[in-house]
């Protein structure tokens, strides 16, 4: 049952869920530290906490250097960008379904217009929705209504409400994601309350009193607001939602420290340190007012001579003999020669950083980055061509990433189903029956190049013909997913080519061993020529036999190509054969 206005004001004075809101805000801020790109120095709590940890890890002088190397945007922004780019393939599923049932065909047509032109679906979920998924996982989806209805039908809309704007809330007992009520502050500093019966808006006075501005009823029977994301960190904290990178936040902190500290190493370890015996300089000006002392000038009062910048002026003789270019030069005292034994040490030496240490730091940074991507996306994500990998590893990476995508897909489907159902009920009432949303059964996880590499690996490791057929089909569907005509043509060509997984050379060798017939070999070696002839004498292979069963169509084409291979001329084929 809905609240009275006095009860709503009491909620404002004594809000619920304060501790959970604070935890959710802190969690989102820590996520945003690694996901949101900033160009200005924003020392919020996650940044301060991170720098405090670094300060405890290293000595003070090293910490001061670390601070000078720490700038925004941080290095982990690039890692999370790569991660979420991989996960965004959830919106690139094959065979997506958006099925809406209405009692009236007019309402169904109106909804198709309304959701595409007004709500900007489905693209709004891959833009605004994905942005909230990355940075504000604890945001709340709110379906709202205009204050005044203008057209013939209500015009509900939805938005993502940041958890930082929520003042008080309570979830339903049976559904920990659906709100029983919610109270939040708008950007205009208005106080809004929504429950299962009404939309209420207040103006707030300087005395912190609430003045009623809007009080509109709705007949949904439930509060039109829910947590955007369904998956929680734990059963004990169902209102704190889990991001794909939540469990790796500490690892992101370590990678950021390591990559920043490596900048210090790069600053000096890339260049050698030269050393040589110190040189005795006897420079003195003609008037005797300037003389060299350890490479810098002093006056007749034995005081350092400074330039306009306040720094000691270098000796014109010594400075011209100093090291030019990258590196450092250190002077060492000339050794005393005892008993007239000369010092045979090389007067000029060069000290370089240990190559093994440098390579370790480079490789370790790369390993940490790859491990983060692998941990969050679930598996290899992309095929590594520089390392040996077998078929089982490829399958494991593919299946693990698919599992992650299916989990994310389910979360977006639940959120969009709630929004679309609620908007349809508010706009069409009893005319709306149901909706079914499915982002697709499979995803374009790999690029055509990566799939081709996987195909090569599976072929070399002895995969079955059925597995290779499925992967070849996936390569074609992925590469030509935006060109359905070419996709259909290549799928047909793949069907009619004999021994399609053999190269021309492999086919010839098997023919010599009497494994394949001469007829099949001729078709394989002359397939492009035979197909062009078939299309000249009949029609293109896509349109040919379009009224026939697909299996029958392929059978006719294959038999015709075999006739070509056997030397028959002017063979004409009718699709009705």
What are these regions (language model features)?
Residues 88-521, 529:
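Extended alpha-helical, oligomerization-prone segments that build pores/tubes and scaffolds
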Residues 1-158, 514, 521-577:
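Extended, helix-rich architectural segments
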